Amino acid sequence: MTAKRLRIEDDALLRGRGRFIDDAHQDNQAFGHFVRSPHAHARIVSIDTAPALAAPGALAVLTAADLRAAGVGSVSVHPPIKGRGGAPIVEPPRPALAAERVMHVGQAVALVVANSAIAAQDAAEAVVVEYDAIDPAIGAASALAPDAPQLWPEAPGNLAIDWGFPRSENDANARAVEQAIKDAPHVARVSYVNQRVVVASIEPRGATAIYDPAHDRCTLRVCSQGVAALREGLARIMGVDRSRLRVITEDVGGAFGMKSSPYPEYPALLVAARMTGRRCTGCPPDRRPFSATIPRGALFSTARWRSTPRASSSPCGFARWSISARFSDHSARRLQP
């Protein structure tokens, strides 16, 4: 461990020769800008893309209908875990571009493609989206309250999964814990919150999509934390065999866990490249990295201790509620022993 090791990765970076997403622009490159929801929860009444298409430099405006026609499926990244009694996790659909409803501030509603990044941003501001705002559920505790707005019909009570150890209420350890709490002369409780955490990487998320019509193949240059898993996920989302999709990651300016999953922007950019016949870059994420980035979900925890007359104590129970970090503030799951 004390032996000197030669670092070979620094030379190019120190000389300014790194290859990040913004370093690979080419002639005839197109740029994408996403129209995002200003609401935490709302119905989409209508989307008028005509003014944006008429804007200078605009090439295309994609909505959920375009992605649906291209065969793009749900952008879901939930692990296939099971809760008590073997019940699977509830996995509501997550479209790459919102269709009927938006479920969090910053959810992508449309993608505008233009000849320059500035032209794409200007055209995106011309997209007219009419919303009908709905009461949101903010935070895990409020989302699980009996009078909370029902967010997904697939998840009654906004509960995605009830998971924990032991998995059975009849487990001997569970009965022993409850009996110890019942018999204890004193029981102490403490509740605490681990706040949500979002990553502020030096290089924001971004990707460049390229379509090869001669071989009907797509390439995605993306700052990621592993191309193999990302390729598998994107191939499933796009509804294509993985042999038709190539994922390339070169230098990455920080990640810390938030660049490991397929994001909704990626399939949208791939479809845009196929529709326009142009390399299409979306970087950075519209100057809204926090509202468009998967965070670590907040944890709301309660612990119980039993104490004896001799002042000794031992933990007896632990319950935890968590906001789902895989979609938004409005899909809560509970982890409870």
List PLM regions with ranges:
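Buried hydrophobic positions in well-ordered alpha/beta secondary-structure cores of metabolic enzymes
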Residues: 14, 27, 52, 116, ...
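Thiamine diphosphate
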Residues: 251-274, 283-284
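Gly/Pro-rich active-site capping loops and adjacent beta-alpha segments
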Residues: 69, 92, 103, 119-143, ...
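Proline/glycine-anchored alpha-helix kink/cap motifs
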Residues: 207-211, 232-246, 267-282, 305, ...
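Alpha-helix capping and helix-loop boundary segments enriched in small/acidic/polar residues
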Residues: 197, 221-225, 256-263, 289-293
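Conserved beta-alpha junction segments in alpha/beta enzyme cores
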Residues: 177-238, 297, 324
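Flexible, low-hydrophobicity surface segments
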Residues: 1-162, 294-295
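Beta-strand segments within the central parallel beta-sheet cores of soluble alpha/beta enzyme folds
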Residues: 64, 244-250, 278-287, 314-319
